């Protein structure tokens, strides 16, 4: 083994214990501009950096959700930089962190591949104007109705067999992203 690392899918407290367990070369975390407080999140990314552990990012476009934003969230981004895709905004956000060494992006066609390549050829950090636009989009997304479910699963098992945390997650995601196809698939 030349480089030792791990993929992480739990709360930050667990992440910190794993990072402190040994001298890792890298870790893989879910990270994007909407998931800065999810799992390891921004706090974990910064802690890994303080320990010299490189970051591999998965879900930079949140399973494609950030590539297909509703108009209320995409309008500030489009106005700030016409011609850049919504996926490009998500990828550039993640690339803006020095400790991010690899960004994994799931692509399903050549157009997405070309868009990702053009995003990083060359990579251009956000301008102050673009940061303001992205903050406006994030604020708009986070302002949408949310039922407050944390996914703790204390409501399970449900006597009627309903997977309550999953149903609430789908409802929250639909309220925020208005993606009927994603909601129906889940």
Locate each region found by the language model.
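Short beta-strand/loop segments at the ligand-binding rim of alpha/beta enzyme cores
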Residues: 1-5, 54
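Conserved acidic residues
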Residues: 2, 25-28, 101
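Catalytic beta/alpha-barrel core
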Residues: 5-10, 28-35
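Residue-level recognition of alpha-helix initiation/capping sites
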Residues: 9-10, 38-39, 85
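Distinct, well-ordered alpha-helical segments
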Residues: 10-23, 41
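Glycine/Thr-rich phosphate-binding loops of Rossmann-like dinucleotide-binding domains
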Residues: 14, 37, 113
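Structured C-terminal cap/extension of enzyme domains
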Residues: 21-23, 42-186
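Short gly/pro/ser/thr-enriched loop/turn and capping motifs at secondary-structure boundaries
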Residues: 33-37, 62-65
């Amino acid at each position: 083994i030349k480089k030792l690392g791990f993929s992480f899918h739990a709360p930050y407290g667990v992440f910190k214990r794993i990072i402190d367990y040994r001298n890792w070369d890298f870790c893989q975390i879910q990270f994007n501009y909407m998931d800065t407080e999810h799992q390891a999140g921004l706090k974990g990314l910064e802690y890994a950096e303080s320990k010299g552990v490189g970051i591999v990012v998965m879900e930079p476009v949140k399973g494609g959700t950030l590539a297909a934003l509703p108009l209320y969230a995409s309008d500030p981004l489009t106005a700030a930089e016409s011609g850049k895709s919504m996926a490009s905004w998500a990828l550039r956000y993640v690339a803006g962190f020095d400790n991010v060494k690899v960004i994994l992006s799931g692509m399903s066609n050549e157009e997405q591949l070309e868009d990702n390549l053009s995003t990083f050829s060359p990579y251009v950090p956000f301008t102050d104007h673009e940061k303001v636009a992205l903050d406006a989009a994030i604020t708009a997304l986070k302002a949408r109705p949310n039922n407050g479910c944390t996914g703790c699963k204390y409501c399970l098992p449900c006597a009627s067999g309903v997977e309550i945390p999953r149903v609430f997650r789908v409802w929250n995601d639909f309220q925020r992203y208005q993606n009927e196809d994603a909601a129906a698939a889940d």
